[in-house]
């Protein structure tokens, strides 16, 4: 049975507290408030909490007339994630030329074709659950729990996609001098500490820090990254395809889901690594 989860329109039963912990759901039909799925992803994603944008993208098509016959074709409108930096003025002495400044705008294209399908640089990610009828019947809110697991998985995958792109860019070692030279304010900096724990320590106030920057732990990389995460984003295609199959005559079931994600990092110069 094929289906689609609309990340922009569908709602998720609120089985979680603000920290993402599942609440105990009583048997029966509990009256719960609903939570938009895009908000749930933002709440779970570590890179989003560090400042990155999570873009739930629905391909926008534009009607374009052709020739004089009135025929219309649908054309996909290219979208971008853009960052821009301050373009300071410089003192120019009499008789001197103005120095050419670096172009202050950088952008990365979102790679979706006219049919909303994936193109180059957009990764396709899948997951699959298998369970029997006994499992299905033994949980009072089985479908809701599966939905929450998928949404949390999208958040984790978004983290892994963006952090993988940052690590692949081989950032320079972090120093406060480098951050100052890049025009990054202290309040913009956030750190994510990977499984190697490089540079991580807990200060006297119980706050995890890496190279002095407030940090959080992530299982999705080994390195430690410090940077201005507001200059990065992850695109998640708004439609997540879900297929439910019966895998045996005993009624065993499988749920398969497919999602398209793309890291968007126009400028990697505002990210650094922390050594061990």
Ranges and model annotations:
Residues 100-174, 251-261:
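Long, contiguous amphipathic alpha-helices that act as assembly "spine/axial" helices in icosahedral shell
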Residues 85, 196-198, 259-261:
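A broadly conserved detector of short glycine/acidic/proline-rich loop/turn motifs that flank catalytic sites
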Residues 38-43, 202-276:
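Sequence/fold signature of self-assembling virion shell proteins
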Residues 179-219:
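Extended amphipathic alpha-helical segments with heptad-repeat/coiled-coil character used for oligomerization
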Residues 1-3:
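A generic N-terminal leader/anchor concept
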Residues 6-9, 16-122:
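Assembly/oligomerization interface modules of large self-assembling protein complexes
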């Amino acid at each position: 049975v094929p289906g689609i989860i609309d990340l922009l329109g569908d709602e998720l039963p609120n089985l979680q507290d603000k920290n993402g912990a599942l609440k105990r759901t009583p048997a029966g039909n509990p009256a719960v408030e609903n939570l938009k799925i895009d908000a749930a992803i933002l709440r779970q994603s570590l890179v989003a909490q560090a400042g990155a944008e999570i873009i739930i993208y629905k391909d926008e098509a534009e009607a374009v007339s052709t020739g004089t016959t009135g025929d219309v074709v649908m054309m996909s409108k290219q979208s971008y994630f853009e960052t821009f930096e301050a373009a300071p003025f410089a003192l120019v002495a009499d008789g001197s030329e103005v120095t050419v400044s670096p172009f202050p705008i950088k952008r990365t294209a979102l790679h979706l074709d006219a049919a909303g399908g994936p193109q180059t640089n957009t990764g396709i990610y899948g997951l699959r659950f298998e369970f029997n009828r006994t499992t299905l019947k033994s949980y009072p809110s089985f479908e809701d729990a599966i939905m929450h697991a998928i949404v949390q998985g999208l958040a984790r995958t978004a983290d892994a996609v963006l952090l993988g792109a940052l690590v692949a860019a081989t950032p320079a070692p972090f120093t406060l001098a480098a951050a100052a030279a890049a025009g990054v304010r202290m309040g913009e900096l956030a750190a994510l500490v990977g499984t190697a724990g490089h540079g991580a320590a807990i200060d006297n106030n119980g706050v995890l820090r890496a190279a002095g920057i407030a940090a959080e732990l992530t299982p999705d990389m080994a390195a430690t990254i410090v940077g201005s995460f507001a200059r990065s984003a992850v695109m998640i295609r708004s439609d997540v395809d879900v297929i439910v199959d019966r895998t045996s005559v005993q009624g065993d079931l499988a749920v398969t889901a497919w999602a398209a994600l793309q890291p968007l990092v126009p400028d990697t110069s505002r990210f650094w690594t922390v050594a061990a």
